[in-house]
């Protein structure tokens, strides 16, 4: 057995797991807790429609603080260790500064007479971001999966609501809400346990589906919806969690078996392509290409686990998909070779314009959130060139991500800072693939992230609000039988 891993399966853990323009600021990533402001909004690029960047100063012993924010003739002055904007005032400032930079200047007087002066800028991009973000709020523990909720936030302001929660689902575990190409009318998520199912939001209707069968190794786990809305591609996984005894590592998760399946939502059918269900290969994390003509997924050779866990490395694969017949091709190709890069890939996501694919790279394995070395990587699908993303990545886990509908922004979950709590960060991508220093989701309360003891899990962008809420989902859990799917 691999030294350092306890091969101990804990049921509660299992439920948790399944269940470059002129003037633009590219900046540098910093995880230094001694930064003068928090959140770190210094020298970032933001969309013109983002909510106010409220923040506070981090110095000890502040006696007096003044912040001056200016753009041309517009000047705004804030006194005190917090800078909290009125929404309309902020929106007017962003609209006037679109395509240019806003200047920030602060003077801090500390106990003992010391004075600190700080200056920085925020660049305002004219590329709007999709106005809604969904995420799962969950405690970052191993055995805690109760009181889980999926929330939807308008990121143009601070309005937020639950679209599924523990209170309406008998404290069920639920898995994260994903959209197809950031479409509010095409999304899905799971409610696990008794009376649960996959909830498919398509064309104004929400359906409750049973995406499982005795012939499959498990119910569906990870996946994505085809751009047409007719199909879904999913993995079926036997997931094993184990604890490290090494002090610098916490939890290791791996699959002992995993295959891919195609769901036909029109015919209520599941298809298992033989080429994507080999016993000697572990296949997982499937997604569709932007045009729906291909499937990208991660694959690794089967091996003895957990003994060989540090040898388990996944490559990024591609196979054709016939969207008329709902069938895959027979000749998968390697897009990113794990042996060549000496790493392991997971969470691929294609940009809606078809130009980029972003994915997470770890040293090994397939469950990266407790791997501090995890970083985001992006490939140009037209040229095969890998983009340098040093400005985005940190010294903590940077993992799940999703694209905006115009392919100009992406959001990702990062544990930068304390290494425990995931927060949603945003970055801009220009036509050449150049990315900007990320900024965390703004909050009305500038102290919220220090006080919040839950992770923002699987952040996913959307071009509008979904047409359901926690109460309607709860009613479906209680009263609606899940539609059965037959394996063909």
Per-region residue spans from a language model:
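Bacterial Sec-dependent N-terminal signal peptides
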Residues: 1-27
């Amino acid at each position: 057995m691999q030294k350092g891993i306890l091969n101990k399966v804990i049921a509660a853990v299992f439920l948790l797991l399944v269940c470059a323009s002129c003037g633009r600021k590219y900046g540098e990533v910093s995880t230094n807790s001694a930064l003068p402001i928090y959140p770190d909004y210094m020298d970032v690029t933001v969309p013109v429609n983002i909510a106010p960047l409220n923040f506070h100063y981090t110095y000890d012993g502040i006696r007096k603080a003044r912040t001056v924010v200016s753009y041309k003739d517009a000047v705004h002055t804030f006194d005190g260790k917090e800078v909290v904007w009125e929404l309309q005032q902020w929106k007017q400032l962003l609209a006037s500064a679109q395509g240019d930079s806003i200047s920030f200047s602060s003077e801090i007087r500390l106990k003992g007479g010391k004075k600190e002066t700080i200056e920085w800028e925020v660049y305002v991009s004219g590329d709007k971001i999709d106005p809604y973000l969904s995420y799962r709020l969950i405690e970052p523990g191993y055995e805690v999966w109760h009181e889980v909720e999926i929330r939807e936030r308008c990121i143009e302001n601070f309005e937020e609501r639950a679209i599924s929660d523990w209170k309406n689902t008998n404290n069920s575990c639920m898995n994260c809400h994903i959209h197809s190409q950031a479409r509010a009318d095409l999304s899905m998520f799971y409610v696990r346990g008794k009376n649960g199912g996959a909830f498919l939001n398509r064309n104004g209707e929400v359906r409750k589906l049973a995406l499982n069968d005795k012939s499959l190794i498990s119910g569906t786990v990870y996946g994505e919806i085809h751009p047409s809305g007719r199909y879904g591609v999913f993995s079926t996984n036997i997931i094993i969690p184990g604890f490290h005894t090494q002090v610098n590592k916490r939890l290791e998760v791996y699959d002992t078996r995993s295959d891919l399946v195609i769901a036909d939502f029109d015919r209520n059918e599941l298809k298992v392509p033989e080429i994507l269900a080999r016993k000697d290969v572990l296949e997982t994390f499937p997604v569709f290409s932007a045009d729906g003509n291909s499937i990208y997924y991660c694959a690794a050779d089967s091996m003895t686990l957990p003994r060989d866990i540090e040898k388990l490395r996944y490559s990024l694969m591609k196979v054709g998909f016939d969207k008329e017949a709902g069938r895959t091709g027979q000749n998968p190709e390697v897009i990113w070779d794990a042996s060549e890069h000496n790493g392991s890939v997971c969470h691929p996501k294609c940009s809606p314009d078809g130009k980029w694919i972003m994915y997470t790279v770890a040293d090994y394995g397939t469950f990266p959130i407790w791997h501090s070395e995890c970083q985001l990587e992006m490939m140009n699908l037209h040229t095969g060139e890998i983009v340098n993303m040093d400005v985005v990545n940190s010294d903590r886990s940077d993992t799940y991500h999703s694209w905006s509908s115009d392919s100009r922004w992406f959001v990702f979950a990062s544990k930068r800072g304390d290494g425990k709590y995931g927060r949603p960060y945003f970055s801009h991508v220009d036509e050449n693939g150049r990315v900007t220093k990320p900024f965390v989701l703004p909050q009305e309360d500038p102290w919220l992230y220090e006080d919040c003891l839950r992770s923002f899990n699987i952040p996913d962008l959307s071009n509008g609000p979904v047409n359901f809420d926690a109460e309607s989902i709860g009613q479906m859990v209680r009263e609606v039988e899940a539609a059965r799917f037959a394996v063909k």
